[in-house]
């Protein structure tokens, strides 16, 4: 039975993950990390400054991180120092932060890093890749919507979409929203919506004269992300050190 520690335990994803781990038959909830201590589905949440002590005492097999970028970098370094495998679902990293994490991980521990752990989203990315390859001469727009409390924009999932489109349809200027008089150039329009309790909506629109193709994914509950993250957690334990993606977990082509 794999022992799991969850960073960001008091957050929306942390609570969903904690409940699902506690209810599972093959995972054990070893504890949580957050800003303030508290109870956590039969385990305990300890303050972030106590992460090293928790990892040393509980000796978990895997640490799952859904926090914010600067905290996640430190959590990754702590896990690597304690030989704990990683699932990183935090988004909004700078290139420099990604480099710091890669240095900590490579040669030390296995880690799955993904901007979205939903199985459906990973299939959606594959469809976007194929459409981008075949529809290079179409106008492309990306629209994403999330709840009012999501801080990073565009979302990590949308950034992955843009990366895929650059690879398959050719690099284009990214135009974030539109205002005023302008002619369309070699660009991808990117539109961000924040409001209410929207879990996560993503649409890629390919348009040409007389037709439009839309690819969309809509999440209705955070459990789809948590389920994928736990699938990755089960998979990553015992793997060779290095950075993996959900494509590796699911046996898909690179996304």
From Swiss-Prot:
Pathway: Amino-acid biosynthesis; L-lysine biosynthesis via DAP pathway; (S)-tetrahydrodipicolinate from L-aspartate: step 4/4. One of its GO terms (biological process) is diaminopimelate biosynthetic process. Belongs to the DapB family. This is 4-hydroxy-tetrahydrodipicolinate reductase. SUPFAM superfamilies: Glyceraldehyde-3-phosphate dehydrogenase-like, C-terminal domain, NAD(P)-binding Rossmann-fold domains. NCBIfam families: dapB. The active site is at residues 146, 150. Transmembrane segments: none annotated. PANTHER family: 4-HYDROXY-TETRAHYDRODIPICOLINATE REDUCTASE 1, CHLOROPLASTIC-RELATED, DIHYDRODIPICOLINATE REDUCTASE. The gene is dapB. Gene3D superfamilies: Dihydrodipicolinate Reductase, domain 2 (3.30.360.10), NAD(P)-binding Rossmann-like Domain (3.40.50.720). Keywords: Amino-acid biosynthesis, Cytoplasm, Diaminopimelate biosynthesis, Lysine biosynthesis, NAD, NADP, Oxidoreductase. (S)-2,3,4,5-tetrahydrodipicolinate binds at residues 147, 156-157.
